[in-house]
Amino acid sequence: MSRYTPSEFAHQIGTGLLSFPVTHFKSDLSFDEAAYRANLSWLFSHEAAGLFAAGGTGEFFSLTPAETDRVVRAAVAETGGRLPVIAPAGYGTAMAKEYCQAAEAAGADGILLLPPYLTEASADGVAAHVEQVCKSTRLGVIVYNRANQVLDENHLERLAERCPNLVGFKDGVGDLELMTRIYSRLGERFTYIGGLPTAETFAMPYLTMGVTTYSSAIFNFVPKFALDFYAAVRAADHAKAYAMLNDFVLPYIALRNRKRGYAVSIVKAGMKVIGRSAGPVRAPLTDLTEAELAELSALVARIADVQKLAA
């Protein structure tokens, strides 16, 4: 059972940076629970406000429901209540409800509702999907506005009235006008989370629209850098934030953009660079080439000593 009411959950996840761990695989691509838990233990030495288990960076799309349950249970066990664990739900409405029920049974504290899979629907249909999922669980729900699951301020306002446990809004669209309209209409009703790939890029402008946190993929392998950047953003230290963007984030994004799917692959590559390998990605994703891995290694070395990052 969650330690948080939905409103308490919403408050907690808005207080700091959110961790978005990769899912560890063995060479045969099976889930490596021991390595996953050991890595979470290391990450806990760096302060975060919440943890997304088996999320997008955790290759949710490549996990079976049983594997997802194992990952969530491992995260719950390893965190030991130190921070909220956010479990994924996705695909069609019926499956999303089952994921929510499994998350509750596993002891997760909240739900990240990912977009439905391989279907197109009207905003009214998407809103109905979100409402049904929210009403199937007692946990606080974060809706991920992305791909084929994009809601505007009108639909979100109605959902907020009908679903008290819909407490989070994660943006993966990057439409500043839409974000402005949503925040102007809903205000503090939601906790707003940045959810674009390499969310650091959007952190400064999004802060002015109520987005107090984001899920950081680079926290996986350069946690101190990620936390320092987040602190600079929250302190409105634009000079420091832009320097950090130029030193690491923007070159990192250029490497990430080499191939579709690298938003996940490059994070696992970063883990390998610091000596904390999480294994390969599962198909249809592909790992970075050796040459690209060397480029990433040079980027990481530019910002800090690798041994200190892995200590």
Curated annotation (Swiss-Prot):
Its EC number is 4.2.1.41. GO terms for biological process: D-glucarate catabolic process. Pfam families: DHDPS (PF00701). Pathway: Carbohydrate acid metabolism; D-glucarate degradation; 2,5-dioxopentanoate from D-glucarate: step 2/2. SUPFAM superfamilies: Aldolase. Keywords: Lyase, Plasmid. GO terms for molecular function: 4-hydroxy-tetrahydrodipicolinate synthase activity; 5-dehydro-4-deoxyglucarate dehydratase activity. The keyword Repressor does not apply. It catalyses: 5-dehydro-4-deoxy-D-glucarate + H(+) = 2,5-dioxopentanoate + CO2 + H2O. InterPro entries: Aldolase_TIM (IPR013785), DapA-like (IPR002220), Dehydro-deoxyglucarate_dehyd (IPR017655). The keyword Lyase applies. Belongs to the DapA family. NCBIfam families: KdgD, PRK03620.1. This is Probable 5-dehydro-4-deoxyglucarate dehydratase. It comes from Ralstonia nicotianae (strain ATCC BAA-1114 / GMI1000) (Ralstonia solanacearum).
